[in-house]
């Protein structure tokens, strides 16, 4: 029986990826469709992807598939053909190609079965996720941005919005997508007669959000086809003005793709213009925050003097302090509340 999971250490896999000479292409895709047996589908797809040396993160559920991966360029067409023939629902699926890509976005393939491909918190049995808003292509997006009757809604997290967004887009202040959905309905009640345009990174969140808005009585709802990634690519190809300002945050080693030259965010430590995210180098913290090169040098890649001091301790002492620590379960926490408490950043919602 073939091995259907990774057995090599992360450090070894990352070193192997960094030593690769063959270029890779970073791709994201999703599809809402019914998967009768997610585990069986996962196991079959895992064998297809490993045979093609695909790295990345793939989630499957009864409601569909969500993937962010990298593929060796020499195997890209074979990958496309095998994906399209794997299931009729995937035939011709749009693949979002990364806008800025050094091919070093992933170093291991992780494929998991989940309850949902996007954690939405929806338990309403009458909700029809297929009743989505209409797609908008790049030219349509620009036209809507000039329409005074249109309202753009950013369905991404606070740390994504902070470094880049469409002109005058509304942020839904929440730490998770499941928190955003009811807040979006509440915030947009006063705009119920407007044209609601929803967007996210690659389309998966705003597609479901558009269906949720329609479920809650909003009739004029659109969402951007392929999200920010597809919009920027098509706008550039068609010679259209790119109306997204700043950087597009991505969930891999790159942590962002430059869309425009503007830097609209600031270093969370000194306030200098900066839009480069990093994780605190103290493994007992690992806070996601924005740090300029000067502060990275001053704090040794840490978010605070406390973390800097802890990082300087012997490794054994660091492990002892991490063991059983109250906030040990906050590793990888990206919440606005934790960011504000550690770095004294004012909450824009207050």
From Swiss-Prot:
GO terms for molecular function: oxidoreductase activity, acting on paired donors, with incorporation or reduction of molecular oxygen. Keywords: Oxidoreductase, tRNA processing. It comes from the Bacteria. Residues 319-350 are annotated as: Disordered. SUPFAM superfamilies: Rhodanese/Cell cycle control phosphatase. The active site is at 200 (cysteine persulfide intermediate). GO terms for biological process: tRNA modification. It catalyses: uridine(34) in tRNA + AH2 + O2 = 5-hydroxyuridine(34) in tRNA + A + H2O. The keyword Secreted does not apply. Residues 146-240 form the Rhodanese domain. Residues 319-328 have a biased composition (Basic and acidic residues). Its EC number is 1.14.-.-. Belongs to the TrhO family. Catalyzes oxygen-dependent 5-hydroxyuridine (ho5U) modification at position 34 in tRNAs. This is tRNA uridine(34) hydroxylase. It comes from Salmonella schwarzengrund (strain CVM19633). The gene is trhO.
